[in-house]
From Swiss-Prot:
<comment type="similarity">
    <text>Belongs to the 5-formyltetrahydrofolate cyclo-ligase family.</text>
</comment>
<keyword id="KW-0067">ATP-binding</keyword>
<feature type="binding site">
    <location>
        <position position="61"/>
    </location>
    <ligand>
        <name>substrate</name>
    </ligand>
</feature>
<keyword id="KW-0007">Acetylation</keyword>
<dbReference type="GO" id="GO:0006536">
    <property type="term" value="P:glutamate metabolic process"/>
</dbReference>
<keyword id="KW-0963">Cytoplasm</keyword>
<feature type="binding site">
    <location>
        <begin position="148"/>
        <end position="152"/>
    </location>
    <ligand>
        <name>substrate</name>
    </ligand>
</feature>
<dbReference type="Pfam" id="PF01812">
    <property type="entry name" value="5-FTHF_cyc-lig"/>
</dbReference>
<feature type="binding site">
    <location>
        <begin position="145"/>
        <end position="153"/>
    </location>
    <ligand>
        <name>ATP</name>
    </ligand>
</feature>
<feature type="binding site">
    <location>
        <position position="154"/>
    </location>
    <ligand>
        <name>Mg(2+)</name>
    </ligand>
</feature>
<dbReference type="GO" id="GO:0035999">
    <property type="term" value="P:tetrahydrofolate interconversion"/>
</dbReference>
<feature type="binding site">
    <location>
        <position position="56"/>
    </location>
    <ligand>
        <name>substrate</name>
    </ligand>
</feature>
<protein>
    <recommendedName>
        <fullName>5-formyltetrahydrofolate cyclo-ligase</fullName>
        <ecNumber>6.3.3.2</ecNumber>
    </recommendedName>
</protein>
<keyword id="KW-0887">Epilepsy</keyword>
<keyword id="KW-0479">Metal-binding</keyword>
<feature type="binding site">
    <location>
        <position position="189"/>
    </location>
    <ligand>
        <name>Mg(2+)</name>
    </ligand>
</feature>
<feature type="binding site">
    <location>
        <position position="14"/>
    </location>
    <ligand>
        <name>ATP</name>
    </ligand>
</feature>
């Protein structure tokens, strides 16, 4: 598929997925989030990972709060995204407790993240990551992912490959409504290792 056609197909699919997500009730979003939290906690890749990056969820994403609490209860090391909005650059920076999240300033997307002047341990500078939880608008069962069009995670995964010998395991968290038959992709789009949703089988 030509680049312009891929871009057009992505735009169209993003619109459709946003409609699907808007149609979900808060109760259904919470129900599926709880199911996925339990799947994550039982997942072999999660259990063996020590250094984990996880996104702080927006309203139309799987709620990650319970997973974050479990990361700390198990003594794992937790990193969250710090986006630079003037570019597609993103770092994963360390937080020390779940309670810290409520004290962070919020971005224009209403996501808490440490400010630019807040000096923190950055994952790729101190040993890399074992596991990255991936957000997204849509996914297919082959691991193709449709993001929001900014390219933050694709660029970050490429940096991971330059900084660490073993690629981090990538685990996408999705509502059933976000699973597509086929996600249009180009050569810059990075596949995820596994898409986790209510009806998926887990490792």
């Amino acid at each position: 598929m030509a680049a312009a056609a891929v871009s057009s197909a992505k735009r169209s699919l993003r619109g459709e997925l946003k409609q699907r997500l808007r149609a979900m009730s808060a109760e259904e979003r919470l129900r599926q989030s709880r199911v996925l939290s339990q799947k994550v906690i039982a997942h072999s890749e999660y259990q063996k990972s020590k250094r984990i990056s996880i996104f702080l969820s927006m309203q139309d994403e799987i709620e990650t709060e319970e997973i974050i609490k479990d990361i700390f209860q198990r003594g794992k090391i937790c990193f969250i995204p710090r986006y630079r909005f003037q570019s597609n650059h993103m770092d994963m920076v360390r937080i020390e407790s779940p309670e810290e999240i409520s004290l962070l300033p919020k971005t224009s997307w209403n996501i808490p993240q440490p400010g630019e002047g807040d000096v923190r341990e950055e994952a790729l500078s101190t040993g890399g990551l074992d596991l990255i939880f991936m957000p997204g608008l849509g996914f297919d069962k082959h691991g193709n992912r449709l993001g929001r069009g900014k390219g933050y995670y694709d660029a970050y995964l490429k940096r991971c490959l330059q900084h660490q010998e073993v690629k981090p395991y990538t685990l996408a968290l999705a509502f059933k409504e976000q699973i597509c038959l086929q996600v249009p992709v180009n050569e810059n789009d990075m596949k995820v290792d596994e898409v986790l949703y209510e009806d998926s089988s887990t490792a």
